[in-house]
Design a protein with these regions (language model features):
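ATP/NTP phosphate-donor binding region
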Residues: 1
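Flexible loop/turn connectors
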Residues: 4, 8-17, 21-110
Length: 113
């Protein structure tokens, strides 16, 4: 629905970053239905690297967070607090990874959108 509204505004754009991969897959469907080639005309990127990102065509470029590591550390912290053990004095920084697939290309020369 958001992609339909965006296309309806009549403005030129060359890329869309979506909140998650499911929304990106929906946006890709709308673009395809409107005869817009992903990524040649519009690049598309998702977020979370769920299964659908590997099965849409073109395969979706996305951002992956280390969810299992994050969940494990959160569970360990919750258990420590539940057992009234002191919480570790550690700050955890989790770095995302760009998963390059086929839905993004470099902008065309002179494209400022």
């Amino acid at each position: 629905q958001a992609m339909t509204e965006l296309l309806g505004r009549g403005r030129h754009f060359s890329a869309v970053a979506c909140y998650n991969d499911s929304m990106a897959a929906g946006a890709m469907g709308v673009l395809n239905d409107n005869g817009i080639d992903v990524p040649r005309e519009i690049s598309l990127i998702g977020f979370d690297d769920v299964l659908i990102s590997r099965y849409v065509r073109p395969r979706l470029t996305t951002v992956r967070y280390p969810i299992v590591t994050m969940a494990t550390q959160a569970a360990e912290l919750a258990l420590a607090l539940a057992e009234q053990r002191p919480a570790p004095e550690i700050t955890h920084l989790f770095s995302p990874t760009l998963v390059r697939r086929h839905s993004v290309v470099a902008p065309q020369e002179g494209d400022k959108s």
